[in-house]
């Protein structure tokens, strides 16, 4: 009996885009950079090949253009080395890719599926991060490669992203989802307190308060 698997290109590119942005630090630096470049170019080409011509130039160009202009000026004045300038270019492409690819998914009625894909991959990242925190502890966790996906700041922000994605991908009118949502908030706050990331703790606390306090018009 032959078993076939269908891989949706939008889902695949969503997973790859997250991998390009949040790379595991156990990989060699050269491999991380090369994979990021390949993925960003692939997402860029895929997006502009399927996007309407009038939508290729969008609002993301405003921010990306400012970053690119400042990078060029810094490079010409000697403030940036070649690596710094390359990082700035990749940042520009990353911002454009995220904005334009999500917009394309919205047009193709794939936005909810994209959110679910983001929830799944970020959830996996959080599980791996939690394991690495248990193994490494909190000593010198400001170091960029302290945990599997970066230092205490990057690791904490992953959990903020995950909590937000849970709220976006689940129906909050259901009590079981509300309970899980609150549990995620509490556990994430506890984790950020443990590894000493005050900014993430405050952010999660504010989001939690905003979630439980009813909005008054």
Can you name each region flagged by the protein language model?
Residues 1-217:
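Hydrophobic transmembrane helix bundles of membrane-integrated enzymes that assemble
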């Amino acid at each position: 009996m032959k078993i076939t698997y269908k891989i949706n290109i939008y889902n695949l590119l969503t997973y790859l885009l997250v991998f390009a942005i949040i790379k595991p630090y156990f990989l060699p630096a050269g491999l991380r950079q090369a994979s990021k470049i390949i993925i960003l170019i692939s997402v860029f080409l895929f997006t502009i090949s399927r996007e309407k011509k009038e939508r290729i130039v969008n609002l993301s160009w405003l921010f990306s253009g400012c970053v690119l202009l400042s990078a060029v000026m810094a490079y010409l004045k000697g403030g940036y080395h070649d690596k710094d300038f390359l990082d700035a270019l990749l940042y520009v492409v990353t911002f454009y890719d995220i904005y334009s690819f999500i917009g394309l998914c919205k047009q193709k009625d794939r936005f909810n599926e994209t959110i679910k894909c983001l929830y799944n991959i970020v959830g996996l990242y959080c599980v791996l991060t939690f394991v690495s925190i248990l193994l490494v502890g909190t000593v010198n966790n400001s170091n960029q490669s302290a945990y599997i996906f970066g230092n205490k700041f990057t690791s904490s922000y992953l959990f903020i992203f995950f909590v937000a994605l849970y709220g976006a991908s689940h129906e909050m009118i259901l009590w079981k989802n509300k309970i899980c949502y609150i549990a995620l908030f509490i556990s994430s706050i506890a984790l950020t307190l443990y590894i000493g990331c005050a900014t993430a703790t405050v952010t999660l606390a504010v989001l939690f308060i905003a979630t439980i306090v009813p909005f008054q018009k």
